[in-house]
C-alpha cells in the first residue's frame, strides 16, 4: 500500500519541475515586449535586409523607440513600452520574413518565458 505522503511528495516533485505558465491576450504589453525584443534582435542580426526593405517601402515607418533600441546595446526593453499593440503587429507582420523567421522566434521566446497567448 502506497502511503499518502509518498503520493503527495511525488505530486510536489512533478509540480516543482513544471515551468509556470501564463496565458495573456496577444495585445498584452508583456507579449508586445517579447515580440519587440525578438524584432530588435532580428533587425540587429539582419540590418542590411531591413535597410533594403525600408528603401523599397519608404512609407513603412518605425517608431523612434525601435531605432534607438536597435543601436543601443544596453537594456532596451524600457524604451519599447508604450508602443501600441496595433503598431507592434503591423511592424512585425509587415516584413516578408515574418512567417519564416520572426514568427518561430517569437513563439520560442514566448514559450521560453512561459507565456501563451489567446486571441483578443
Curated annotation (Swiss-Prot):
Entry keyword Signal: yes
Entry's Gene Ontology cellular component terms: fungal-type cell wall; fungal-type vacuole
Annotated signal peptide: 1-20
Keyword ATP-binding among UniProt keywords: no
One record GO biological process: fungal-type cell wall organization
Keyword terms, alphabetized: Signal
GO molecular function: structural constituent of cell wall
Pfam family, one: SRP1_TIP1
Similarity annotation: Belongs to the SRP1/TIP1 family. Seripauperin subfamily.
Descriptive protein name: Seripauperin-1
Gene label: PAU1
Amino acid at each position: 500500500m502506497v502511503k499518502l505522503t509518498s503520493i503527495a511528495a511525488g505530486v510536489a516533485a512533478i509540480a516543482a519541475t513544471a515551468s509556470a505558465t501564463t496565458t495573456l491576450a496577444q495585445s498584452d504589453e508583456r507579449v508586445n515586449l517579447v515580440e519587440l525584443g525578438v524584432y530588435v534582435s532580428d533587425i540587429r542580426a539582419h540590418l542590411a535586409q531591413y535597410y533594403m526593405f525600408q528603401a523599397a517601402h519608404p512609407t513603412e515607418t518605425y517608431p523612434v523607440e525601435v531605432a534607438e533600441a536597435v543601436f543601443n546595446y544596453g537594456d532596451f526593453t524600457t524604451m519599447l513600452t508604450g508602443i501600441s499593440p496595433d503598431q507592434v503587429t503591423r511592424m512585425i507582420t509587415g516584413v516578408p520574413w515574418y512567417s519564416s523567421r520572426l514568427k518561430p522566434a517569437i513563439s520560442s521566446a514566448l514559450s521560453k518565458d512561459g507565456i501563451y497567448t489567446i486571441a483578443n
